[in-house]
Swiss-Prot record:
Residues 317-343 are annotated as: Disordered. GO terms for cellular component: actin filament; cell cortex; myofibril. GO terms for biological process: actin filament depolymerization; barbed-end actin filament capping; positive regulation of neuron projection development; regulation of lamellipodium assembly. It comes from the Eukaryota. This is Twinfilin. It comes from Aedes aegypti. Interacts with G-actin; ADP-actin form. PROSITE patterns: ADF_H (PS51263).
Length: 343
């Protein structure tokens, strides 16, 4: 996500990430401040993790202010103590805040050390940030032992094969496609676009969690659209193209899949190719009718003329020219007949 938001941990936070794994720190709070991840507060271990939980976490959770909370559990893994990542993004948060925190979480995990984070909670209500909320989350989302990356890929392929429906709605499934889940901010951005708040959305697949996130929601002039296309990573885009055609005003939603060739990894190319069908179906389930799907490898292609031609291809007038048919062949000189006299 750092490719889009540019938000990374500041020097103080990076230094504390190294220090907090000594076993003495129980919890730390991280927020996005001045376009960087910053350490807001931290508390030392006092009792066991269950007794410390509500006493230390509750004071860190503010009503309408999103944050990340990293909480040290008491069991160990090969790299040290296991940690819980609590992402607190309340419903009252703005769409921009939701997008920022969803888009920056992968960077936070990477800089803290993904292998140390063994559990995650995405909380939108204060009840979900309590010990009871954590215990309920464990019950609701209890799962088998973690799979390797290869096992996860195979499981996704099998799941997509099982879910393929050969009935009337087969066209919505895309045979062999992977149905990546979408984040809450992504769903909200689609709803907002349907209501007319934006004319452009850009989406990214988080390859680590295999989830689709919105990374840009804006009103973009058609002339500035090519500059929105990344040159080093694949993306999905939605653009509301308003134009005139044959005297009629049309509002056409164009789904664009941009893939800048071999600058992307094989896994990235495979994921974007596999997810585009199910994702476009998800978009339409949000009430947005896609008029045209376009694939490009260069943002410079995405001009007003190009989109117009894709929506309204020119019909070539190739009527065959028929020559005048020839008359019957000559049968010799015409005979003159005298009219007979009337008696």
């Amino acid at each position: 996500m750092s490719h889009q938001t540019g938000i990374k941990a500041n020097a103080e936070l990076l230094k504390f990430f190294g220090k907090c794994k000594d076993g003495k720190t129980r919890v730390l709070k991280v927020s996005i401040e001045n376009e960087e991840l910053a350490l807001v507060d931290h508390k030392a271990v006092k009792k066991d993790w269950e007794k410390d939980y509500d006493a230390l976490v509750k004071p860190l959770v503010e009503d309408d202010v999103p944050c990340y909370i990293l909480y040290r559990l008491d069991y160990k893994i090969p790299t040290g103590y296991a940690w819980l990542l609590l992402s607190w993004v309340p419903e009252a948060a703005t769409v921009r805040q939701k997008m920022l925190y969803a888009s920056t979480k992968a960077t936070l995990k990477l800089e803290f050390g993904s292998s140390n984070i063994k559990e995650e909670i995405n909380a939108t209500t204060k009840e979900e940030t309590t010990l009871k909320g954590y215990q309920k989350h464990k019950i609701d989302f209890s799962a088998p032992a973690p799979l390797t990356s290869r096992e996860e890929e195979l499981a996704e392929i099998r799941k997509s094969e099982v879910k393929t429906d050969f009935g009337i709605d087969t066209k919505q499934q895309t045979l062999g496609g992977i149905n990546c889940p979408i984040s809450d901010p992504t769903s909200q951005a689609l709803i907002d676009m349907r209501r007319g708040a934006y004319n452009y959305l850009q989406f990214r697949i988080d390859l680590e969690e295999e989830k689709i996130h919105v990374v840009n929601a804006a009103n973009i002039d058609i002339l500035k659209l090519p500059s929105q296309i990344p040159k080093d990573h694949a993306r999905y885009h939605l653009y509301l193209f308003k134009h005139q055609h044959e005297g009629n005003h049309l509002d056409s939603v164009v789904f664009v899949y941009s893939m800048p060739g071999y600058t992307c990894s094989i896994r990235e190319r495979m994921m974007y190719s596999s997810c585009k069908g199910p994702f476009s179906a998800t978009i339409e389930k949000h009430g947005i009718e896609i008029t045209k799907k376009i694939e490009i490898d260069n943002g410079e292609e995405l001009t007003e003329e190009f989109i117009y031609e894709e929506l309204h291809p020119r019909k070539l007038n190739l009527r065959p020219q028929f020559s005048k048919p020839k008359g019957p062949p000559s049968r010799g000189a015409k005979r003159l007949t005298k009219p007979q006299a009337v008696e």
